[in-house]
A protein has these predicted regions:
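Bacterial Sec-dependent N-terminal signal peptides
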Residues: 1, 5-72
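Contiguous segments within soluble domain cores/interaction surfaces
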Residues: 63-86, 91, 97-98, 102-142, ...
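Short beta-strand segments within Ig-like beta-sandwich modules, predominantly Fibronectin type-III
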Residues: 139-144, 276-281, 364-369, 565-570, ...
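A short tyrosine-centered beta-strand micro-motif
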Residues: 163-167, 296-298, 387-389, 586
Length: 883
């Protein structure tokens, strides 16, 4: 060890003496013998040290090893300040849905390093994607105190299948797309007779369209196949080194990613067994073996439960390197890393870092001096959750990496008591919610709450905010039952969690970028409000940008309101507006003029096509696992209850109302509403395309809008374009003819050859609709009816040179959750089949940290409650209750 001070303290030590959840900025501590220095002393010493780090050893000479390491240290220490990362968690009211339901959600946006509510981004994007990977609905939400909420309506365009809910802020896209929040929920066909014995029907065809990659299997990365099994080896530190001991995790699955039980044995070149281990949890295990001079001559055998034995290849061994063995935290809660190195590395000065979600917590130098060295550190030298220890050379070459877990602070506790253990039909439900130690959290506790009828749960619950932010976001692939790792703090659960980190560990931050060895490319800015930015191109095939252009924008809101703004493009042709906040859709009219104040043909591109590429579904997340319902007497007695006297009035007061004829806005009348307009097509179609959004994406990217049928054949693999004998093109659906209907038949004479002529497109394969539209006796020749709907909004503006007219989407206004009141305004009914009885995206507490919630059960004769609470406090403590 080469410490900065004589007492052997580390060069940098971050957050070691501070509680979890400090502000999102680095605080630099240098630990000295007489205690901690004052803030002014720390900053002064840090400035001197960082200045020293940039000074070469002598003029014209190469920097020393210490200089190079210190340069890495300084970049690591500043990384989280320069590139602060956010994380998102979305709490849903339910775990599965039926067509026609609403998906209610509450989103939490936090700093990744300390899990405090973000003060950076003010805009959040929440999207609903279908199995094809198409964005069915997109919400742009205003973030306040790290919170936002909304709902998706599963209308006629949302058919049964698996849907993905995705959420992100714009700066989150500067990193790997795997860091975007993503969750898959099943949507079942709504039964014709609700309340009858439940027969679930899920119509899924995940791989039928082109946009989303084929469904994936969460196999061990880097796995090798052995006798039909997939086996992955993961040496601690990242590599197998000749002449060094073996400490490795392994995982065994079948070809579909299902974990398997097996025993792994290692045999030396002379046939001696040098290691044996069995799988423990989810097909994962850990094996140790003494050092071997040549690991390529070691034979590995795997024996499954049926006694079948197959040979397995070990990873390629390296002649030079280091090996790390992490020992579980001891009684004194210290971290112990046993490091072994080959002779060539034992005298080198190396660097050691511990980072947690992009934040540097420990930086130091290390010199082995011997074949093995024990590195012992206090637990508070690490962050809370998944940490990464990295051992590296002065030139930035990583010798070894090891992910490990540090137990976080306890959750902020929330108590929920009920007035009854079970309820009758349409009866009042009263819950008392309280937060013990409310004053300790600064009276700033925010959480959302869902109450479901437990008997209506279809699948097992999804990961909560703790599993998502602390674990799943730092793990590669799909994690089955992440809540298991938090059920208990015993050795079995801790060992399973450590195996998971070794097997599925994923580096959410590129260490080379953190250390300043690779550039960090920032493509997306922080959105502190309604940002409208883009680039102006000259329209030529070279796509040259237009610097020093003046640009004005006119935002036309519903009614007579308008917002106006002006700006100029920079030297690269880029522009940006910070528009006042508005809600709902609007039309934007952009007008550009060159430096001579003349209108010229140009392409005004907007930077709003932010959505990441659709990911592949994991096959494991498509396996529906029913919940484990426990209605035993012991379970009933565990439900916290309180005595309550029903004082709610039972007389229903009906207000006198005046019924008038319902009128319609005829602005978009005529052909646009003929036979119900788009609603008619939605009712009978199986596939819906938001063509208006697709057109905007082409224009935003500066590309020409394609032809209607050319685009459809590229978008949907069921369609093809055939060449007719006359040299024209003919659209076919799965080899059959297509009937095209424009505006439900009212737009027969309209030209729809260009995609920008349309607002939406729907594919109908309903036999009755085909029979009604097809010529007599020709139904068998027709593959589908293609409904095309033209766009009325684009026809109310005059298009001029140097202008672009486009839709602008404002913030999505939150909608209040509907819950009937059977004692005031509504009569009890036998057809109330609500599965979510209560949803509150932001429960308000009084000054004592308490709240009383009252609502009504559904029409089931006997029912129990399932309660879900997720949230956070202002100081970074998480809130999670699933009961």
């Amino acid at each position: 060890m080469v410490p900065l001070h004589r007492d052997g303290a580390p060069l940098f030590y971050f957050f070691g003496a501070l509680p979890f959840g400090q502000p999102c900025r680095n605080v630099y501590f240098c630990k000295i013998k007489h205690g901690f220095m004052t803030t002014r002393q720390r900053l002064f010493l840090l400035s001197v040290l960082l200045a020293f780090a940039g000074i070469p050893s002598a003029k014209g000479q190469r920097p020393t090893s210490f200089d190079s390491l210190y340069s890495c240290f300084s970049h690591l220490s500043r990384y989280n300040v320069a590139y602060t990362r956010e994380q998102v968690f979305v709490h849903l009211d339910n775990n599965a849905y039926f067509t026609g339901d609403d998906i209610w959600y509450s989103a939490y946006v936090v700093y990744g390093s300390n899990l405090r509510p973000t003060g950076m981004s003010r805009v959040l994007y929440v999207e609903l994607l279908n199995e094809s990977g198409n964005v069915v609905q997109r919400h742009r939400l205003r973030v306040q105190d790290g919170r936002a909420n909304g709902n998706f309506k599963l209308d006629e365009t949302c058919h049964s299948g698996y849907y993905e809910i995705r959420a992100y802020t714009r700066p989150m896209l500067n990193w790997d797309e795997a860091g975007v929040f993503s969750r898959v929920v099943p949507v079942f066909v709504r039964p014709e007779q609700e309340g009858a014995p439940r027969q679930l029907e899920l119509r899924s065809n995940v791989s039928s369209h082109r946009n989303r990659p084929a469904d994936a299997v969460s196999l061990p990365h880097g796995a090798v196949e052995a006798g039909g099994l997939q086996v992955g080896f993961y040496p601690e530190g990242g590599q197998l080194v000749d002449g060094q001991p073996l400490h490795a995790a392994f995982k065994v699955t079948d070809g579909q990613g299902v974990s398997q039980r097996a025993t792994l044995r290692l045999f030396s070149a002379d046939g001696r067994e040098v290691g044996r281990a069995a799988t423990r949890y989810m097909g994962m295990g850990h094996i140790d073996a003494q050092a071997q001079p040549d690991w390529s001559r070691v034979r590995a055998e795997l024996t499954d439960e049926q006694g079948h034995t197959v040979s397995v290849s070990l990873p390629e061994a390296h002649r030079e390197g280091t090996v790390i063995c992490f020992n579980a935290p001891s009684a004194d809660d210290s971290l112990r890393f046993e490091i072994s190195a080959t002779p060539s590395l034992r005298r080198q000065l190396l660097g050691v870092s511990i980072t947690c979600r992009g934040e540097a917590h420990y930086l130091d130098t290390l010199r082995m001096g011997a074949a093995q060295k024990m590195l012992t550190l206090p637990a508070d030298y690490a962050g809370q959750g998944v940490n990464e220890l990295t051992l590296f050379t002065p030139d930035g070459r990583i010798l070894a990496e090891r992910l490990f877990w540090r137990e976080p602070d306890s959750l902020a506790r929330v108590d929920v008591r009920q007035n009854r253990a079970h309820y009758g039909a349409c009866s009042p439900v009263v819950l008392k919610v309280s937060v013990p130690r409310y004053e300790d959290y600064g009276s700033n506790v925010r959480f959302s709450m869902a109450v479901r009828e437990a008997g209506s749960d279809i699948v097992r619950r999804a990961p909560g905010i703790r599993e998502q932010l602390l674990l799943s976001s730092s793990v590669r692939g799909y994690v089955e039952r992440p809540e298991y790792y938090f059920e208990s703090a015993d050795s079995a659960h801790r060992a399973a969690l450590d195996l998971l980190l070794q097997v599925q560990g994923w580096r959410s931050h590129n260490w080379q970028q953190m250390a300043g060895l690779e550039p960090m490319r920032v493509r997306h800015p922080v959105e502190e409000g309604m940002l409208i930015d883009g680039t102006i191109y000259d329209g030529s095939s070279r796509r040259r940008t237009c610097p020093d252009y003046s640009l004005s924008v006119r935002i036309v809101l519903p009614g007579s309101n308008q917002l106006k703004g002006e700006t100029r493009t920079d030297s690269l042709g880029n522009f940006s507006f910070m528009a006042p906040s508005f809600y709902g859709p609007a039309m934007g009219v952009f007008s550009a003029r060159n430096a001579r104040d003349k209108r010229k043909y140009c392409i005004i591109s907007l930077h709003r096509n932010l959505a990441p590429q659709p990911r592949a579904y994991w096959k494991q997340e498509l396996r529906l696992v029913p919940p484990q319902l426990d209605y035993t007497a012991a379970r009933l007695t565990e439900t916290p209850l309180f005595s309550w006297q029903d004082t709610i009035r039972t007389d229903i007061q009906l207000r006198e109302v005046t019924v008038s004829e319902k009128g319609y806005d005829d602005y978009y009348g005529g052909r646009y509403t003929w036979m119900g307009g788009e609603e008619y097509g939605k009712k009978y179609s199986e596939t819906y395309y938001n063509v208006a959004d697709e057109v905007e994406q082409y224009m935003d990217q500066g590309f020409d809008v394609p032809g209607t049928y050319e685009w459809l054949a590229e978008k949907d693999r069921r369609f093809t374009l055939d060449v007719t004998p006359e040299g024209g093109e003919r659209l076919r659906f799965m080899g059959k003819q297509v009937i095209t209907v424009v505006d439900n038949g009212a737009g027969k004479l309209l030209s729809v050859d260009r995609l920008d002529d349309l607002r939406s497109m729907m594919v109908c394969t309903d036999a009755a609709e085909i029979s009604r539209r097809a010529p007599v006796g020709q139904s068998h020749r027709i593959g589908c009816v293609l409904f095309l709907y033209t766009d009325p909004a684009m026809n109310i503006f005059d298009h001029r040179k140097g202008e672009r007219i486009t839709r602008l989407e404002g913030y999505r206004a939150p909608v209040e959750f509907y819950s009937p009141n059977y004692r005031k305004t509504e009569m009890p009914t036998t057809t109330d089949f609500r599965r979510t009885l209560y949803w509150n995206p932001d429960v308000e507490l009084d000054s004592r940290g308490e709240a009383t919630l009252t609502f009504y059960s559904n029409s089931q004769p006997t029912q129990r409650l399932a309660v879900s609470v997720q949230g956070f406090t202002a100081d970074g403590h998480l809130i999670e209750l699933e009961r």
